């Protein structure tokens, strides 16, 4: 679906509004499937098992529903305003998932984690629920650098058991973070047969998408999303980027608790 068409549909859907931004803040847990690119900018796609989890307590929280699998502590600063610290899972980049990386003998970036801080604001503008989330993350491996993201989401539709929302997100990275994913050292250049490339700091990627859920009963629901992501900044010009835009989708069965 082209971007203008998706935006027109989102605007039309504002007539009946969902109850909560990011569909809900209900506690839930369950299994899911995700279809995604091998890495942002890859032509190869892969399907993987992912958790569907959300528990927003005080002080503890854990969730996978805001684009990152994260857990930590948070505190309430005011009505609808929370600040916290988190540990997050960082998926890395595996050459075996990408025909391009494998054919050029590019090394893996191992799965890792990060430490960070976040601020989140939930508010209703009339009947429209909105969530704004800002996060900063520093990889455990100092060579993997720092990232910051800003995410906005809103509920836009509810009819019977079906709810939907939209979201947009932008991610910035310092030079180490961008270069670790998209840079090519002179040594790697010789092995891979690709030109050496050094990526700098700045905007890394932007994305927008659709969130949806279907209630199956008081305790069970199906949740999912559709996402379109674009590689930006220095990363966009890397020889490792086969496509500047990627699509992903996920769906899962969750139990409310």
Where are these regions (language model features)?
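Cleavable N-terminal export/targeting peptides
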Residues: 1-26, 42
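Short glycine/proline- and aromatic-enriched beta-strand/turn motifs that initiate or cap beta-hairpins
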Residues: 21-68
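Hydrophobic core residues within well-ordered beta-strands of beta-rich domains
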Residues: 27, 49, 81, 115, ...
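Residues on the lipid-exposed face of transmembrane beta-strands in outer-membrane beta-barrel proteins
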Residues: 31-35, 51-57, 71-75, 117-121, ...
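Outer-membrane pore/translocation modules
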Residues: 62-165, 175-201, 227-235, 239-245
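Predominantly the C-terminal beta-signal and adjacent terminal strand-loop region
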Residues: 166, 208, 212-257
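Short amphipathic alpha-helix initiation/capping segments at coil-to-helix junctions
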Residues: 198-206, 213
């Amino acid at each position: 679906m082209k971007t203008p068409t998706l935006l027109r549909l989102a605007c039309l859907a504002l007539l009946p509004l969902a109850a909560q931004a990011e569909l809900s803040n209900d506690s839930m847990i369950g299994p899911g499937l995700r279809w995604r690119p091998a890495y942002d900018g890859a032509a190869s796609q892969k399907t993987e098992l992912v958790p569907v989890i959300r528990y927003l307590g005080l002080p503890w929280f854990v969730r996978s529903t805001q684009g990152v699998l994260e857990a930590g502590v948070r505190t309430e600063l005011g009505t609808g305003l929370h600040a916290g610290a988190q540990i997050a899972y960082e998926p890395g980049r595996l050459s075996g998932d990408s025909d391009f990386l494998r054919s050029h003998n590019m090394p893996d970036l191992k799965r890792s984690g990060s430490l960070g801080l976040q601020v989140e604001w939930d508010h209703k503008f009339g009947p429209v629920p909105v969530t704004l989330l800002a996060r900063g993350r520093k990889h455990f491996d100092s060579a993997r650098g720092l990232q910051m993201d800003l995410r906005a989401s809103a509920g836009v539709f509810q009819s019977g058991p079906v709810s939907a929302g939209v979201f947009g997100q932008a991610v910035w990275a310092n030079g180490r973070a961008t270069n670790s994913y998209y840079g090519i050292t002179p040594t790697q250049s010789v092995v891979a047969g690709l030109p050496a490339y050094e990526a700098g700091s700045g905007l890394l990627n932007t994305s927008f998408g659709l969130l949806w859920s279907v209630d199956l009963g008081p305790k069970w629901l199906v949740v999912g999303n559709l996402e379109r992501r674009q590689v930006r900044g220095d990363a966009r010009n890397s020889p490792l980027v086969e496509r500047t835009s990627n699509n992903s989708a996920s769906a899962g069965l969750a139990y409310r608790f």
